[in-house]
């Protein structure tokens, strides 16, 4: 199950006490801020959570799975996320408690 923006808005409404309009504006502004920073080539560091950064990937050979024909996969820039140590520890603790 995925956490959606709508669910984030609901949680802000329930747990923080923002009204739904304010909560939606907050969530939208947060993602706009992240998007703008990445568009400017900035790294995003969220303490206790992780880092978002841009990575350049070189062109490489690929293959059309239907025909087997070799095709080039063009160079591109991708967004990567590296989880922080605190997030890793919390996820590990949660996963460990479910086994």
From Swiss-Prot:
SS bonds (residue pairs): none
Signal sequence coordinates: none
GO MF term (any one): DNA binding
Keyword DNA-binding: yes
Record carries keyword Transcription regulation: yes
GO biological process: DNA recombination; positive regulation of metabolic process; regulation of DNA-templated transcription; regulation of translation
UniProt xrefs under SUPFAM superfamilies: IHF-like DNA-binding proteins
Superkingdom of this protein's organism: Bacteria
One Pfam family cited in the UniProt record for this chain: Bac_DNA_binding
UniProt keyword terms in alphabetical order: DNA recombination, DNA-binding, Transcription, Transcription regulation, Translation regulation
GO CC annotation: cytosol
Classification via CDD domains: IHF_A
Assembly and binders: Heterodimer of an alpha and a beta chain.
Family: Belongs to the bacterial histone-like protein family.
Record protein name field: Integration host factor subunit alpha
């Amino acid at each position: 199950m995925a956490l959606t923006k709508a669910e984030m808005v609901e949680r802000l409404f329930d747990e923080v006490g923002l009204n739904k309009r304010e909560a939606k504006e907050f969530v939208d502004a947060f993602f706009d801020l992240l998007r703008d920073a990445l568009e400017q080539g900035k790294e995003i560091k969220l303490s206790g959570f992780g880092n978002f950064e841009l990575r350049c990937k070189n062109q490489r050979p690929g293959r059309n799975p239907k025909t087997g024909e070799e095709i080039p996969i063009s160079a591109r820039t991708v967004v990567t996320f590296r989880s922080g140590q605190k997030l890793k520890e919390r996820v590990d603790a949660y996963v460990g408690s479910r086994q």
